[in-house]
């Protein structure tokens, strides 16, 4: 039988980092074992499910390049199948109609609480046949009363739950729509899911689902419940901690490889290794090596991983992602250096691609004003002579590349008996609009020669104005 995993998000919001990690672990385990990975959209909550959320989930999966073998399947397209399963359970005596109102069930729970017993439905309609003809009803699963359910969890080890602790859960609402614990069981059965990887907040559902699977005569998959992700305050990660949807990390300038690498280490490790290629993840990952304790989300660590990938990946590939940020910031890159060249000189100067796009604007756009602090510090009256001379030397170059450019700047400094900084810094402000840039000769080489001369002339106008102002 083919090993099969699945990722089954509910489209009630964006794809968050916890869901993305679950998807990654499921995808990796299937890949490692030559299996199938299913994408299933659990959209039976008709009031909260939205197409926008479906789109956000799909966008996130595609951006992370977690390709699925089968799907996406939508639960709303399978109601007939769920009804078949419900009828099967009723026919086999494993489910029944319950006519108790919600108020009556609440009273049952309160009574149990007062007696110090487990708060659950008391099974009033479990074996009754005197069904009223004019009252609404739900369908409940007839949970076994004796014995234990053993979850053989690949992460947590064996977990035993007494059937006496479990409720006769509702598997169909009064309007006939199936509930989560029924639909997920039928889907996993029909789709031949062999390994269920999900967050440990689902542990409480697992014994109920195992009992339903057995009542249907279905195989029980192996389970792996991975621990939750915590914020820096030790509480479950949420928006309050800065947790955002996967696509927000794209928008903020992170590479998908960086986010995947960071997520795989949130709950799994291989010695002290921090950086993993996709191929290494597939080769080394094993659910049995996942931690049992929760992991803490650290944005600074994610930034460090992102910087590593920006600096070490093929600049042409990084440039493909940088292009999105350039367009997002309204920067037209048709006229200017190749983005891969920009990546080569900027990658070790920034934390994110968004930042890289922002500081690289001067390669593609003329600026209407210079940085005020840089002007005050570097475009003083004394720089007029070196600016004029370096402009002449740069204009005379027939080879517009870093080495001749560097020689022109150096010759200007030597000729006027100045330090390189006395020539280079005013030139940097003139060419880039500010006081920070990569190596000046390389920066100028990526700019058009005539553009550099034009910008020096504009900077000289500023210098002349300062001279005139005294």
UniProtKB/Swiss-Prot annotation:
Motif ('KMSKS' region): 236-240
Gene Ontology, cellular component aspect: cytosol
Signal peptide range in chain numbering: none
Top enzyme category: ligase
Pfam family, one: tRNA-synt_1c
Main location: cytoplasm
EC number per UniProt: 6.1.1.17
UniProt entry keywords in alphabetical sequence: Aminoacyl-tRNA synthetase, ATP-binding, Cytoplasm, Ligase, Nucleotide-binding, Protein biosynthesis
Residues that, per the record, bind ATP: 239
Motif 'HIGH' region, residue numbers: 9-19
One GO MF term: tRNA binding
Known catalytic reactions: tRNA(Glu) + L-glutamate + ATP = L-glutamyl-tRNA(Glu) + AMP + diphosphate
GO process terms (BP): glutamyl-tRNA aminoacylation
Membrane-spanning parts: none
Subcellular location: Cytoplasm
Entry-linked PANTHER family: GLUTAMATE--TRNA LIGASE, GLUTAMATE--TRNA LIGASE, MITOCHONDRIAL-RELATED
NCBIfam families: gltX_bact
Function in brief: Catalyzes the attachment of glutamate to tRNA(Glu) in a two-step reaction: glutamate is first activated by ATP to form Glu-AMP and then transferred to the acceptor end of tRNA(Glu).
Subunit structure: Monomer.
Family the UniProt entry places it in: Belongs to the class-I aminoacyl-tRNA synthetase family. Glutamate--tRNA ligase type 1 subfamily.
Protein name: Glutamate--tRNA ligase
Organism: Colwellia psychrerythraea (strain 34H / ATCC BAA-681) (Vibrio psychroerythus)
Chain's gene name: gltX
